[in-house]
């Protein structure tokens, strides 16, 4: 299943926690290419969204794609 991320919420939470893209890659285990794509509005798997959400400590799924 593919989902879309709430980019604004994701980027705001990254800023709030002072987590940059590289750190998000390290903490989540998600590839740099995927993190960049998600930050730019591309959809991702539910599994990927869950990994990113776990690091950020909040739900960031906007909708199923």
Segments (PLM) and residue ranges:
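A short, Lys/Arg-rich alpha-helix, primarily the initiator
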Residues: 1-26, 61
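Recognition helix of helix-turn-helix/homeodomain-like DNA-binding domains
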Residues: 30-43
């Amino acid at each position: 299943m593919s989902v879309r991320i709430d980019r604004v919420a994701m980027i705001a939470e990254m800023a709030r926690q002072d987590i940059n893209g590289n750190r998000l890659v390290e903490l989540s285990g998600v590839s740099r290419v995927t993190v960049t794509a998600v930050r730019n509005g591309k959809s991702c798997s539910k599994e990927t969204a869950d990994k990113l959400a776990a690091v950020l400590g909040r739900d960031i799924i906007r909708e199923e794609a």
